[in-house]
Amino acid sequence: MWKLVVVLTVNLLQGALTDVYVMKDVTLGFGQALEQCREESQLTEEKMEEFFHFWNDDFKFEHRELGCAIQCMSRHFNLLTDSSRMHHENTDKFIKSFPNGEILSQKMIDMIHTCEKTFDSEPDHCWRILRVAECFKDACNKSGLAPSMELILAEFIMESEADK
């Protein structure tokens, strides 16, 4: 009986870790468009630096230009419809383009869609997208999907070293 409990616990932990690693990969992949979107969204160097701390508990969703940057980044990967709502099929393909992305794709799409419905009445696309991002982050934290800043930074440093 104890062996079964241990095996089930290990499997649950491995699944949770896999989810976090997939989220880390999607985050870093999505973030690749940030530099290209900095000017278009009028993001200062300081605010761009803040953006790298998205998963920190103290990250503030206060500045409209952050929403504009997320909108630009989403457009860069063709993840939005003409009305600046999530394009479900393209978002699914984007998430599945990462290792083990199929594990989280539907869950992420459902969370984003739920958040979009909550803020659908916001007429300003940048503000709405910023609110959706905050809602999505909260949903990820509640479901244990949010990667730690340590994990994000470690991967970022490894990628930077590999580029040298």
UniProtKB/Swiss-Prot annotation:
Highest taxon of source: Eukaryota
Q: Which family does it belong to?
A: Belongs to the PBP/GOBP family.
Q: How does it assemble?
A: Homodimer.
Looking at the keywords, is Acetylation present?
no
Which Pfam families would you find in this protein's record?
A: PBP_GOBP
Q: Does the keyword Cell cycle apply?
A: no
Q: Which pairs of positions does the record mark as disulfide bonds?
A: C37-C72, C68-C126, C115-C135
Specify the protein name.
Answer: General odorant-binding protein 1
Please describe what this protein does.
Present in the aqueous fluid surrounding olfactory sensory dendrites and are thought to aid in the capture and transport of hydrophobic odorants into and through this fluid.
Write out the tissue specificity statement of the associated record: Antenna.
Keywords per UniProt? Disulfide bond, Olfaction, Sensory transduction, Signal, Transport
GO BP terms: namely: sensory perception of smell
Which segment of the chain is annotated as a signal peptide? 1-18
InterPro entries registered for this protein in UniProt: Odorant/phero-bd_Lep, PBP/GOBP, PBP_GOBP_sf
Q: Name one GO molecular function term.
A: odorant binding
